[in-house]
C-alpha cells in the first residue's frame, strides 16, 4: 500500500513531462523523400540496363 502514492506521483510526472525527441537531429540526417527518389531513379536505370532488345517493353520507358 505504501507503493501506491509513489506510483501515482511517477505517473503524474511522466504524463506532465514535455515530449522531446529521444535523438535530436544532426547534420547527417537525411529526409526519407529524397532517399526514396534516389531508389526509384536507381531502379529505373537498372531496368534500362537489363533490357537488351529495343522491342521489349522495359526499353520503351514504361
From Swiss-Prot:
Entry's Gene Ontology molecular function annotations: toxin activity
Main localization of the protein described in the UniProt heading: secreted
Location of the protein in the cell: Secreted
Pfam families to which the protein is assigned, alphabetical: Chi-conotoxin
Membrane-traversing stretches: none
Top-level division of the source organism's lineage: Eukaryota
UniProt-listed InterPro entries: T-conotoxin
Maturation propeptide residues: 23-47
In-chain residues carrying the UniProt-annotated modification Methionine sulfoxide: 55
Record's signal peptide: 1-22
Residue(s) carrying Serine amide: 60
Gene Ontology cellular component terms for the protein in this record: extracellular region
Post-translational modification: Contains 2 disulfide bonds.
Tissue specificity of this protein: Expressed by the venom duct. Is mostly present in part 5 of the venom duct (distal part near the pharynx), and less abundantly present in part 4 of the venom duct.
Keywords, in A-Z order: Amidation, Cleavage on pair of basic residues, Disulfide bond, Oxidation, Secreted, Signal, Toxin
Family recorded in the similarity comment: Belongs to the conotoxin T superfamily.
Comment block on domains: The cysteine framework is V (CC-CC).
Name of this protein: Conotoxin TeAr151
Amino acid at each position: 500500500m505504501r507503493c501506491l502514492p509513489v506510483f501515482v506521483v511517477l505517473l503524474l510526472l511522466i504524463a506532465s513531462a514535455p515530449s522531446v525527441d529521444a535523438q535530436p537531429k544532426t547534420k547527417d540526417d537525411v529526409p526519407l523523400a529524397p532517399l526514396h527518389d534516389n531508389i526509384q531513379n536507381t531502379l529505373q536505370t537498372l531496368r534500362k540496363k537489363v533490357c537488351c532488345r529495343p522491342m521489349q517493353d522495359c526499353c520503351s520507358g514504361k
